[in-house]
């Protein structure tokens, strides 16, 4: 059995640290992609009293949030109109991505005789989603004047927040400042938000009315310098499994597909029942590390869909079937932390955590 153990205390402490750091700004907690792999229902249930909003990528994720909490939920992605009636009935906040969305939403709202809560996503330089910057003011004005829309927020997203000195950050901030000025001229109550985790850490002055700290809430810090108080934030989860079999190699034998790992006579291998079918990175095979009884052991051979093997050498520490295996550590400096695994596999911590799938049990402790 593979379990992602999540520390409720660490999670809540992370959020409290962030809230203190951002001052009076509201906190919108992103829980998309199954709460970055941590389990959306459990995360929402244990944080709803600490945050102002939750944010997700699509309608189906939003329904999972509203099933366990009453906080406002913002959907970042495009509007799936097949779900729009339920979204409106549950007061889920939609993101207007194009001027044309306004008329479509108005027509549906009229039919339901219920207003739609909306945030307008403005493309200030990410060039992925959102209303074109040059059309922003017209779209904001139109939505604000609508009898069927409640324009609750206006937002954008930073493209290069992980590089605090990138010139695009200033360009996007300047553009967003002009949008904020126009928006606040209509109403001071409209929530303006730009910053993800690395955005407000790189430049505290861009918190505006609300911030969206996703990866930071789960305990992952940027590589650039941040204030000492932020350094108290810790990863909230450990991925654990068990040794299910010990194998002793004979002379000339190997292990796994294509037998790319060739051991020595008498070498012992531990079989762990987790693989890329669980969302664990296949690239770790033959180069990753696991922790068994406070000793690091290297993976041996290719990772399979449902299992991996590690070399115990001569097994001088007497690893046994049933021993606990730590696959992902909550200590960033460890060789099996999400940070270290991301470096080994040329990716980011978001990827390592969010791809862990539902074959892995989530447990809040």
Swiss-Prot record:
Cofactors (names): pyridoxal 5'-phosphate
Lineage of origin: Bacteria, Pseudomonadati, Pseudomonadota, Gammaproteobacteria, Thiotrichales
Active-site residues, Swiss-Prot/TrEMBL: 32, 257
Protein name per UniProt: Alanine racemase
NCBIfam families: alr
Modified residues annotated as N6-(pyridoxal phosphate)lysine in this record: 32
Residues at which substrate binds: 128, 305
A biological process from GO: D-alanine biosynthetic process
Function: Catalyzes the interconversion of L-alanine and D-alanine. May also act on other amino acids.
Pathway(s) per entry: Amino-acid biosynthesis; D-alanine biosynthesis; D-alanine from L-alanine: step 1/1
Family membership noted in the UniProt record: Belongs to the alanine racemase family.
Keywords, in A-Z order: Isomerase, Pyridoxal phosphate
